[in-house]
Amino acid sequence: MVDPLALRLANTIRATSSGLTDAFATPESTREWLQTNAAHLGTRMDLDDYLPSEADRAALVELRQNVRAVFAEYVSPQPPSSADAAVLPPFPEALTALNNATAPTQRLLGWGRSGPRTLERVLTADDLDTVMAGLADATVEFFTGPVASQIRTCPAPRCVRYFLKSHPRQEWCSVACGNRARAARHYAQHRED
C-alpha cells in the first residue's frame, strides 16, 4: 500500500543512524521528491526542468512544518513526533497557513468540536502555488477521509515518522522500528539488573 501524499509529505523528515535526514535539504533533493510524487500533485508544472529556488524550497519546508503541526494536533494527546515537536508552528497558525496554501484548489480544512471537516473556496495561482496547493489539498483530503483515524506517531527510539496503523497490534511504523524498540527495552531491563 502506498502512503497517502499528506503522510509522505509529513515524513520527508526521517531519522537515520547519522541523525535527521530531510528530503527538502537541497533544491536537488526537493526536485527529486516532487518528481517522485508528481502524479499525485495535481499540477501541470514540468518538474523535469524545475530546480526549486531557495525561496521555493523554504516555502515547501514551511508547508511541511504546517502539515506536521496538523498531524501533531490530530494525534494528541499522544505525543507528536520528536523530530520537530519543539519547533512546530502553533496549531491555529498552521491550520491557517495550510488553508491558505489550498488557494488554487477548492478544499479547505475546517476544524470544529467534532474534528476535521471539508470547506470550499476557489482562487488562482502560479506553478509552485499549484504544487503547494496539491500538497495542501491532499492533506485536507487525508484528514477529512476515512484513514485519518489510523494515524499514529511511531514511538520507537529516534523515529520521527507518522504512520497509518493497519493492524490492531501494530505499534511501530516499520519492522526495523519495532526491533529497535524491543532492543532498547531489553537493554534497559538488563542495565537495571
Task: Give the positions of each predicted feature.
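Contiguous alpha-helical segments
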Residues: 185-193
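Cysteine-rich micro-motifs
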Residues: 168-178
